[in-house]
């Protein structure tokens, strides 16, 4: 699951 921001998934 990605973060609440933008770079949750890198």
Swiss-Prot record:
The keyword Methyltransferase does not apply. It is found in: Secreted. One of its GO terms (cellular component) is extracellular region. GO terms for biological process: neuropeptide signaling pathway. Its main location: secreted. It comes from the Eukaryota. The modification Arginine amide is found at residue 10. Keywords: Amidation, Neuropeptide, Secreted. Coiled coil: none annotated. Myoactive peptide. Stimulates the contraction of the oviduct and foregut. This is Locustatachykinin-2.
């Amino acid at each position: 699951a990605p973060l609440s921001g933008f770079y949750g998934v890198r």
